[in-house]
């Protein structure tokens, strides 16, 4: 029991002269109740629970010095019943007689912007520094405030849970509340029971699932990382790994108690509100369409609870940007998790770490780390107005005016791609340590010969946040505009994979990473090359990062005419998103009868003066 009250003096403690706030939802993680006319509530005590208030519209819960919302009380008598690497929960003792929740009034929260951060996934303090100098630097420059928010979609850190303290301290520089989802790299991976797997997160951040409101939007945060999975999961085809694997594994699903809580919560939320479901593993994805473990087992049950409502799914996990429109579907979804055409929009928000902080350095000193489908690392920005919203993806340190890459897929590019991709797929212990080709072996894709045009040269446009509604047009010189075609229709087909569907702009930057070869005489072995994941060494000859953009749900293409005249040409490409926002890129390319030599002509130099 307790009181939800207006904290008039800002001390966080309930005084009798401070009025209660009525009709506020409070939950014990299963049951949901509403405060009465004096702000009082009563709920059953559960043996292991997070008791939390659901921040109502027009009000704000307090935040601590790290801008982490303070809206919950954790109850776990005896604490975590097993020793965990990062400590878990201490003994919380018996339940207190009352838990009161302070609120403060705010005005004008009908319009706000939320910075949605997928997979910052910092495995080290070095990577937190890169996060600080990329995504957070952009948010600070944007001058967020008022009723804006940040929402991390899980994998905030990479397995070292003590890094949570610093990363949220760094994120607090943006000056707005930091709401967060727990991901599979934010849990206690040495826990032997699901009930304990998020205990360190609960101590360092707060509940693993909860809800909050801003304006006319209800955000529902779910924990869909079930770790360790077991017999209940293994009974579902494709999840046999839950009992057969030597090491404990996770499965993507929302547990039964949480599903009960979700049903109880939705029963209290008016039908006219926008519901934003935030979770780490996507309900479904394009890039992992056939994978059971990386898509949510009980997505269809969640869809049933949301039927008839305006809803939006936000997730991370895949290190891709995927903007899936209602009605879209891909081969593999039905077989993996029983999902067909989507009932509402699903957005996988990309990754602030890009491709796990890999790749060579940008000018600002952070890794390029282009994602699995070639988009830059960055942040999804969503502007809310009432129950409407407009999403846009902002690449780190690239500015808001840029939203796509443009290049050409030539026969030479596809041959080069196949050579390096074949090498990548060989056993790394047995293959030649030096790749068969590098970026230096790729002919300039913007010098085209008649043979290139006859063999198929295509304009490629990677529209980072592209969706089914996106329109892409190209224009050569002063000629008429012509449409380009999305390489995936989203009509039930399988992901198309390979050189023909690769993004040349991204692959050029992913395929030869010079950081592998960094050496010095310092004597510190760990300063060679670079480290990623849990201290894994990336050393040796320059070679590709761990992912190449060999498939894409947001790539548009169009074939160049075979009879383009020789000379220098201008290409302009404009994409228009579903909200009418446009991005335009222009580049210069050449058509030459023969490809000129790429390097300094030493033969001419050494031949001396012409007679």
Stretches found by the model and what they are:
Residues 332-466, 470-473, 559-561, 571-588:
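Binuclear metal-dependent phosphoesterase catalytic core
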Residues 80-164, 610-611:
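N-terminal active-site segment of His-dependent metallophosphoesterases
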Residues 70-91, 161-269, 293-314, 318-393:
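Extended active-site neighborhood of metal-dependent phosphoesterases/phosphodiesterases
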